[in-house]
């Protein structure tokens, strides 16, 4: 019978002597990253650890891990005052057993909240609905997490505010100062954890991306001027293989500006959407790898960048999109480094080359 102990032991063996299951003579990504003083990792769910082959692949390639859902408030506090840490604890145990760091994601977000939270926040007489949760969650993992996405996706230009902030329950209840409150609380709760602001939209080459980059710089600059302890920017890195793509010049300039603020940079949720693509797998895989390479070659050329995490390691757990095209063609997304059989794809090799060429 496969037990948790046997999975962990097997994964360690996989690290010491990589099997022929896709390992070959190529270095694991964690080794390529570590050679350049960086981390490589991915998001995972605790249920995936029951898949022994996946656990081997994860232990082989990753030296940093982030829970995909199991540190979001919807999962952690499904009803008021009732907390479930089981999934995050399992992932942390796996990370510790395999010499990995673990990230926390995410403390304050407009989404993935339990249904009861909106009413509680809007009617809260004080700030404890925000601060108590941060203190409890970060306190539980104090000294055991590399970094936290404290505030996630606070910017939303379509809401039309001069400061660019998203109109969400936290803004409605506390005003813009909810950002300050969250980071100051987080710094007190775990002074050793790197505090990250995480968002998407800074990567692309369209006109709205230009506006989003400008708004992000304005947001960060204003927060730092107020002595808000934001210490790093998380670039989610969700790309589209058949969209406009990355403008490398603009991205490089933006990252240089972030670095000049004294912030570190992490790629936190990288994947490459291949929907709307030709059905030919080889063509899709090439396009996904090319998009990833154009992005990571710039990001890893900046010495403020400390980590790259993909939003999952393998296509094995991805779901088919809806719609007639997917139904008739059998289309399945291929947006992550390993395929459904845990074999290395061109995207995996693009990531490896980006680390090998990193500054």
Model-derived features: positions:
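N-terminal secretory signal peptides and thylakoid transit peptides that target proteins
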Residues: 1-15
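Conserved, mostly hydrophobic/aromatic
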Residues: 65, 95, 148, 233, ...
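Glycoside hydrolase catalytic-domain groove-lining segments
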Residues: 173-181, 190-194, 214-218, 222-278, ...
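Acidic (Asp/Glu)-rich catalytic clusters
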Residues: 32-35, 53-62, 89-101, 140-142, ...
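Short, acidic/polar
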Residues: 47-59, 130-134, 211-221, 292-295
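Aromatic-rich peripheral "rim/lid" segments of glycoside hydrolase catalytic domains that contact
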Residues: 149, 153-159, 164-172, 250-257, ...
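Substrate-binding cleft and catalytic face of glycoside hydrolase catalytic domains
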Residues: 66-69, 76, 87-202, 274
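C-terminal segment of N-terminal export signals and the immediately downstream linker at the start
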Residues: 19-43
